[in-house]
């Protein structure tokens, strides 16, 4: 009597990720890597600064120039904020919480870069206030506004 033939083991079908763009999936992967690195690292300022500057250096123009300038403004205005990356973009944290971040236009195919603030930022102004700002260029007026926003954000 012969044994019944075994069915060939089939690999489970690869699930297609729906709902997220390739850029969003890339950003989530970058964030997962950042979380792992933070867990392993001592989370010192030099490591965060290095990661933020590397993210800026990887950007194309004009985002690179905008990000360099925003980085300089934030670090001069609020030296207590620690530079790091957040979803692959330069960000600035108070303790473990991100206060503000720069998002390049090219990352998500938008026509402007973004300076954003999280709920940690103390920007509250009545019942409604902006938390993100489009950037296409920086002159003295925009730089002064960013300085004021960062000062207010850290309280």
Kindly give the residue locations of the regions a language model identified:
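Charge-dense, helix-prone N-terminal extensions
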Residues: 1-155
């Amino acid at each position: 009597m012969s044994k019944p033939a075994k069915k060939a083991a089939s690999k489970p079908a690869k699930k297609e990720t729906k709902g997220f763009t390739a850029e969003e999936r890339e950003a989530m992967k970058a964030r997962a890597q950042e979380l792992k690195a933070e867990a392993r690292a001592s989370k010192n300022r030099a490591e965060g600064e290095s990661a933020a500057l590397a993210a800026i250096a990887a950007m194309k123009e004009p985002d690179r120039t905008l990000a360099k300038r925003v980085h300089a403004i934030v670090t001069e205005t609020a030296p207590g904020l620690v530079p790091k990356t957040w979803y692959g973009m330069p960000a600035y944290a108070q303790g473990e919480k991100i206060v503000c971040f720069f998002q390049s236009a090219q990352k998500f195919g938008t026509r402007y870069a973004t300076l954003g603030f999280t709920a940690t930022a103390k920007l509250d102004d009545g019942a409604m206030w902006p938390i993100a700002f489009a950037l296409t260029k920086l002159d003295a007026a925009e730089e002064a506004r960013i300085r004021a926003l960062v000062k207010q954000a850290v309280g």
